[in-house]
Amino acid sequence: MELSPSVVREHDRAAPDPSETGTATFGLGCFWGPDARFGALEGVVRTRVGYAGGTRTDPSYHALGDHTEVVQVDFDPERTSYRALAGRALDAHDPNRQVRTTQYQNVVFAVTAAQRETLAAVLEERGLQADAIETRIERLDRFYPAEDYHQKHSLRGTPGLQPVFDELGYDDVELRESPAAAKLNGAAGGYDVGGDLGAGLDLAAGPR
């Protein structure tokens, strides 16, 4: 099956509406890798990268202030959960170690009381406590999307993928928020995504 604009369009049309999804936000070093890793996961609908956790208003990559690079994940609660995603975030690094540079620190954000309770349970399952680990456990006050060139970085760097979205007339925001782009970015990052999109992608050469 070839990856074609029609496949991308139908995948996006069939995806859950943003109002039907939950959201999780994590800092796990440079946000390019986590964007691909989480985008490939079952139940993840959309991803975007950005900045959070600091006090500077309207940060940018070159004026980051005390913010951290993060990936924000929208997920279908009927197919995955905040618990599962937070567990993956914790398992992706050593919670007992932290890098010095705030930009690349490990942080797990919890927005609601339910997420905070869930996160405490996930930590307990691993024999961890929020106040005894190096990973930052914080409430999310505000998320600032990163510049367009940081969004779907693996997809943008894989020959033949972005032109599919260009042919559909997607602008940068639509590419960032595209469920198909999240999956294809994961595939371009080396992860198995399966389904209609994965069937049409040759990781070595882009779309067949």
Give the label of every model feature segment.
Residues 1-208:
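Flexible coil/turn and secondary-structure edge motifs
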